[in-house]
Amino acid sequence: MELENIVANTVLLKAREGGGGNRKGKSKKWRQMLQFPHISQCEELRLSLERDYHSLCERQPIGRLLFREFCATRPELTRCTAFLDGVAEYEVTPDEKRKACGCRLMQNFLSHTGPDLIPEVPRQLVSNCAQRLEQGPCKDLFQELTRLTHEYLSMAPFADYLDSIYFNRFLQWKWLERQPVTKNTFRQYRVLGKGGFGEVCACQVRATGKMYACKKLEKKRIKKRKGEAMALNEKQILEKVNSRFVVSLAYAYETKDALCLVLTLMNGGDLKFHIYHMGQAGFPEARAVFYAAEICCGLEDLHRERIVYRDLKPENILLDDHGHIRISDLGLTVHVPEGQTIKGRVGTVGYMAPEVVKNERYTFSPDWWALGCLLYEMIAGQSPFQQRKKKIKREEVERLVKEVAEEYTDRFSPQARSLCSQLPNKDPAERLGCRGGGAREVKEHPLFKKLNFKRLGAGMLEPPFKPDPQAIYCKDVLDIEQFSTVKGVDLEPTDQDFYQKFATGSVSIPWQNEMVETECFQELNVFGLDGSVPPDLDWKGQPTAPPKKGLLQRLFSRQDCCGNCSDSEEELPTRL
């Protein structure tokens, strides 16, 4: 019914825009949902938290911000963080401006006459940097100085930070991060598509207004297909990878009937839709090259964690609101142990490398093959080994993959043809990306000569296409085929062990990013204006335990715990 689709789309668009109010999609009870505990409630967390400088002060977004606030109270530490910020800026500065940026860093932070000389820096190292800067401003010029600065901060300053109110506030945020996650943490919206074990729908965190995609894995369907290991593998790999070019896992929870993965919402649709349903099939070369470069960065991040993807194809590459891509659907990914190879005839016909088709052993070579196939398809408007809407038997496609070279038209420039021929090389030992240098080999190809990969990796390059914010890039609600009911499968108490491994709640870095991006951190992270300790951080003012509720109070009181508050009277309609 057309009306149902219009209503579902209208509700989703309104949610994406923040609901039209000042709260930007937040519940009217959001402060109550994110209320800090008294610091005395965080003592167990304090004792169990690993004292790792890199994790607490660099990798975790809220930890990094609070450590910077602590450093701002001491001039010598402020100089160190300013230097680190300056180096980060230097590394993403365009080539023609980098030398001037490097000279400013040398003058301000490394010269005895500079205003912000950083401590503990060997003068010989400074001299070497100055000489290298004159010869040519390479991106890693300040790498050793950066390492020494972090080493300095990780000693006495880090120890002092652990005894400060800033670290106590970090413990309060960690306490909130570790609160239980349930279906009541979210508002649910329309179905966006189907996964292997259930629907994918849009959802919104009540406390922050942040939009996500919720991938629901039906418990009975998982059990019937014996998919427990596959589902847990995807969840654990998503949890491990932190890349702007791979969808992020923010939450994992369970309901009575399903296991739920809450992932980055990609509103721009997938590359298959854009290649074939937005005018003439295929992209201009510049657009295809931009997407190939971002996919290359995503594969590099996966391979750095020794993860091979194995299912690279247009429908698994999604666009965000701004037009940047992320790799999605990690169901076939697998970890490759150091020094070992793996075996597995998995993937999608037409994108599987010859060594996969032959069931031979491999490490990361199938991903570089598939990148070549995808780049070819983006430029040519069709797959290199099968024509769209023309049925070819699987055996014939696999023969073409193993034996026949791809054909090129005049849509390919010489550089594009060169890269496309080197990536899908039949021999994995000769394939670009597999000659010992990994992603670096691919990035150094002349087709990417005009791209600054440092700026690309920082999200600083403008994409060639920006999706329409008023468009819904997916099928109509009624065109998404519904799953049939699973019969003959009963859930048993022994299944709970698997569900507990899966439903682990919030994922640290995405959750903290959510708090920062939605300005919850900015609004809640308040200290005493006159330097006084806030009541929730004051050990002297420990709260008294509230009186026990009577039976009737317990029966009729509303659940008001962090993230699980229901505020249905103010909510937008959910999926019809």
Curated annotation (Swiss-Prot):
Modified residues (Phosphothreonine): 485
GO biological process annotation, one example: cellular response to lipopolysaccharide
GO molecular function, one term: ATP binding
Membrane topology designation: Lipid-anchor
Pfam families, A to Z: Pkinase, RGS
Tissue specificity remark: Widely expressed. Detectable in all brain areas examined.
One Gene Ontology cellular component annotation held by this UniProt entry: cytoplasm
Modification sites for Phosphoserine: 484, 566, 568
SMART domains linked to this entry: RGS, S_TK_X, S_TKc
InterPro entries: AGC-kinase_C, GPCR_kinase, Kinase-like_dom_sf, Prot_kinase_dom, Protein_kinase_ATP_BS, RGS, RGS_sf, RGS_subdomain_2
Residue stretches making up the Protein kinase domain: 186-448
Sequence ranges assigned to domain RGS in this UniProt record: 53-171
Binding of ATP, residues: 192-200, 215, 264-270, 315-318
EC number: 2.7.11.16
Lipid linkage positions (S-palmitoyl cysteine): 561-562, 565
Catalyses which reaction(s): [G-protein-coupled receptor] + ATP = [G-protein-coupled receptor]-phosphate + ADP + H(+)
Active site: 311
Keyword Ubl conjugation: no
Keywords, sorted A to Z: ATP-binding, Kinase, Lipoprotein, Membrane, Nucleotide-binding, Palmitate, Phosphoprotein, Serine/threonine-protein kinase, Transferase, Wnt signaling pathway
The name this protein goes by in its record: G protein-coupled receptor kinase 6
Provenance organism: Rattus norvegicus
Gene this chain is encoded by: Grk6
